[in-house]
């Protein structure tokens, strides 16, 4: 046979000479010629007439759709000339966008483009048009074939697609050089190619045919034997007959001989021989091991023969699917390609499915196992049957069928239900896992073959009936399978590797001696990897996609053997915290192509060396125990590597540093292996040139990667943009450049983030390279603590409401809220070439740099020890940025300098936060300095008005310090609140629209002010003799203003609250000051939050959860000490590295996890416990398999050198522990029934320990102090946690600012404070944690809450959530272990807990708290009615009074106490005697219907009618009441626990009661 090599003429087919220069059959050839053509095959250029949005270029060979961001159609192009038969019109996709759905459509049309009226899309072509759209074939716009070929919508840039009209009038589609089969028949003789640049496809280019490749019309092919070269004999081994040997698929013209060298003159110069072989095998495999004839030859050509070898191949394109008729428990989906057994945990059979049509000869029927369950024995069975599914009565299992059925079950073959081959193959179907593939094919010689993961298992039976259907039995463990078609790219790759694994090395690795030294092949991961692993990014990245579901089966190997001295290095990209253990690395002699990969490489017993943890293992046996750095402690961004030296020694690297020789006499030719085990979820190969060797290790620290940082010794930085980004962003230039495509049609969705977390003091700097003037707004930059893998990219980063800090324009935003305006730089004002940098300091401050200049601290308080990533939003005008060379670590002095911090945050600010600023609108004599934190009156005595930059929030304090006085003037500083927005005032000189000269004249909007000791509203006197006289302020005096939640204005002088100055303050008010008279200069000393002094701080919600116990006297003494004493708040608590052997630390040593057994889980806080420091841990996970739970305590011996026992109770020296409800010292119980039972604390509970000033150890639960557990604890001591029994994970949490100090918590009003009586106190004192408490689902609690909301009571009367309420229903009280009665007061008196009620805790005014809420007061209840609840709350006590205890403001309407100026000689009003108040220590009596009337209401949720009662829980001053018998007529005593003579208390004294809680009961 002559093989012609054609030029532009293409390929000729048929006897006789070939046409011109084209290749054809030579004269006298015995068979048809097989040419290899070039050229375009007709219609090489596009017709100049196109759709209205198409522009042509490159001599009519490139077409581009204009305005791709606004339009998705009108992109039709046609070939210039009609197609010639047998020639493929091929185009390459040059560009796609993500804005639309749908993509390129291609086909042919009989319509002449010269006269065609172009429709908007190809589907609108009529009059003889065939178009392939997606995976459907349409004729004149109507679908004629579904599930055809490859889905065109899935093609990417660079893919090639073409159409061909054959000589027989068939339409064929070609995708990337592969024939997809016949798409249509009966085409006219004259058709033009048509391409629609639709949807995502925006640009294509017409391609010439590739050299040496021609897609001819299917031609008869002579028998294989004369063509089989000697080199192919190895491919026909292993029992493969001659007529089963492969032939080249129609997608490739077969070369006359396989090359025996890779010289440049050979057409295969760019391919390795093994690739040629494997592609040829794959082509034959995908073609079903083709018959001798590809189509029926013409009569009389001498090629016809009898038998299967000459039978014509079916040309039907019916997709192989599951038949709609199936087993009774089968559910079909995915267009009948997926079958799933219903109720897999209840039933194990009735799961038979069959194919929708008979199998063709050599057709592969392959399925993938999608889901298995572990309940049953046995698993999937697969085979063929002669029974037609339409007439078959499906059996429970196919092995019950006694005729016409061949099944593979386990590792054997069953024929008609009886075993015919017991050991058919070495694989058992019962051992296959999810993701494995099983296939079968009936060969043309009637032999049946099964395939497992692409590997042919040989002949199962030599004789198979000619008409058989594929059948699958989803039996036992098998639940779900999916049919896999051969056109799936990943399946092709997998099968290719599987076939190569089955081949012998000699057959697959034939190499010719290279003539010259070739460039070394790049190291990649081999595609054959573990079951739970995947290879991405062209073989450079390996990952476990479901890393949180499984911890092993993540083994990956290098694609080739390592050369001597060649370093194989990977970077850890992603880690998870769920598992123990981490990445393992090493080498193996096993070729990855033939290796059956184990679940973990340490299970391999031959030819393997692995570094695991800090040890080295050879063939599964440890050979070095203490070697190098512990791999289990590496973090994301660290690198590990391995190298085999020429002398046979094996060395490992961690972050570029050699760990020394690990093994000797390692043979050459080993493959690198990485085991993505446990926490390691993703790793990427790093070339030697990308990470230079690190010269010397850096000291470890909390904020450094261990043991050294990859970029610390390099001149450049490894910081890049992450591969994950917003939908409109594009990452180029090796990850150093980010741009927003469609920049004139899209302005957002272009967020990019750094590829790793920033280190402390490390600068991330970008340069703006391109901008457009179309939009408003520009680049936004900042940091986020959200990992890129966990970030669901929003439209803009300011949409994220957690763990994110951004600079937008001049505004600093945290979690989407503006924290401050007028920062030192304006990002919206930057242009092309400007550089923006961001850096987190070691102190937790965020600094921005503009063109290298530090702009000062933007915000502080970034979470210590928590990773933050740089994030850039290419928003609005900013289109493109690149990372600069300045990115990397900066000088340490800059990272820790206080100069920039002082500029933005005054050092005397009580709380670190965003400091207040003065608004730029101010009086004409005022100058603002120090970034708006200092105001100076430069002339005169007036025109000194200044405003806050933003509105004051509820309870926010705006405070200034007097810096300069000018004694020649009289008067005082004036301050107050105004509804006038400063930006609404224009510049003026004291009249008209400008600012007035003094604050009393500011009357355009409502203004409240204090001047000297007078309170004025809009200049009118409201009150005299208020607080301290402001005329007496001196240099250093502090004065502040607060808008309270009860709509009152308070003035603070030197931290002391002067009480309410005015009421009825509007919601939106600004602070206003008048630098009048002697006060010349003030400076802001407040932040957006104020740490209040002891005496003025309201009760913290954290202490009002339900505690019934009063603190000791020492707590009150603390409250009388200096007001400036601040509780110590730890900044970076972490667990000590020395811990129990079953402990794994993570999250910067802030999370401890017990990874095995139930003990050996002791951890110690590394920092000593000092007085007033609250150390808290949160219970993250409980394992109900065990009993008991965590143990808390302190130890006074040095923990660094302590050998921890199995449990904390075994500590016999210097240990004080809290376990269950007991207190233990050195293993001996010294107190029982202390506080709540720690064994019953649910997940989410926060437990804390604190030392008071006298050394007493306090236990805190969910922020509530449980009292002194151990007095006089020696110091120094360390907090200890034992993760015992159920408790498997805890995390250190930072305390709330208000509760870090013991004295603060101690002076807060508890809900029900009672004394320690015989060491016993109520166990209800810890409330449910906010997120994980089982009480969250209490229906009774929710019902009572809905009723309380119906009362429409002001929220300010009640404690804020989550300390707002406590439920005493049967289930909730039993869960807490509440006792029915408690004792309280001096002398002690018993009272009953409000069982059956729900308690809503009331606020108590801080001024009255110290004088009234003492441990000497008793607790009682008062039955009430809904009608009087609001009146009682307004008064603040049950008896009539003139002062509201809740607000300390005079009641409205009472004489002599209004805000109007009183007369000079007014006599005080006569007070009325309050009526007697009935109380009871028992709520069963106080809540009786005659004392607490019932009211009917409809539940808004369920619409059911209920009855409800209300009552008050009050504190009663001892001696102010008279006990006696019940006055209400009762049939029997409601509470037998109390004596009848003391069941009712009566008091007439004013101020004898203090409201504590509102109680609600619903029937």
From Swiss-Prot:
* Compositional bias ranges of the Acidic residues kind: 1107-1117
Tell me where in this chain the NHR domain is found: 43-209, 319-486, 522-688, 718-886, 915-1087, 1132-1295
Classification via PROSITE patterns: NHR
Identify residues that carry Phosphoserine: 504, 909
What does the record give as the organism's lineage? Eukaryota, Metazoa, Chordata, Craniata, Vertebrata
Gene name, please?
Neurl4
Any keyword tRNA processing?
A: no
Superkingdom of the source species: Eukaryota
**What name has this protein been given in UniProt?**
Neuralized-like protein 4
Q: Where is this region: Disordered?
A: 1-49, 692-717, 1087-1121
What Gene3D superfamilies does the annotation carry?
2.60.120.920
Q: Which GO terms describe its biological process?
A: mitochondrial DNA repair; spermatogenesis
